[in-house]
Amino acid sequence: MRVKTGPITRKRRKKWLKLAKGYFGHKSIGFKVAKQQVVKSWTYAFRDRKQVKRHFRRLWIARINAATRAQGVSYSLFINGLKKSNIQINRKMLSEIAIHQPKVFDKILTKVKSHLK
């Protein structure tokens, strides 16, 4: 008697099609294309989990740079002054302070300027 793999194959294909739910066009209907797209989306997700950290750091640096240049200090001098004045605030917190509490950021900047001279 031969072994019929119909239910097993259907289950395996439904598993991949469930993962491809919401994709556009044949990528959510056709088994082969759906499987390829799911695997590709996993590679994109893996890559982008690494890249999101870079993107946020660039954003924080751009915000800090804009806030410091408004006061006449470049970003690199500001970071150098932070290290000299032994202020240990990370870039994320500095950018949040620069946006939401500009007076506090100005106080930090004046302290940094005093250590630069």
Curated annotation (Swiss-Prot):
GO cellular component terms, A-Z: ribonucleoprotein complex; ribosome
Listed SUPFAM superfamilies: Ribosomal protein L20
Regions crossing the membrane: none
Alphabetized GO MF terms: rRNA binding; structural constituent of ribosome
Keywords (A to Z) from UniProt: Ribonucleoprotein, Ribosomal protein, RNA-binding, rRNA-binding
Entry-linked InterPro entries: Ribosomal_bL20 (IPR005813), RIBOSOMAL_L20_CS (IPR049946), Ribosomal_protein_bL20_C (IPR035566)
A Pfam entry, by short name: Ribosomal_L20
Keyword match RNA-binding: yes
GO biological process: ribosomal large subunit assembly; translation
PANTHER family in the cross-refs: 39S RIBOSOMAL PROTEIN L20
Family designation: Belongs to the bacterial ribosomal protein bL20 family.
Role: Binds directly to 23S ribosomal RNA and is necessary for the in vitro assembly process of the 50S ribosomal subunit. It is not involved in the protein synthesizing functions of that subunit.
Name under which the protein is recorded: Large ribosomal subunit protein bL20
Species, as recorded: Mycoplasma mobile (strain ATCC 43663 / 163K / NCTC 11711)
Lineage, uppermost ranks: Bacteria, Bacillati, Mycoplasmatota, Mycoplasmoidales, Metamycoplasmataceae
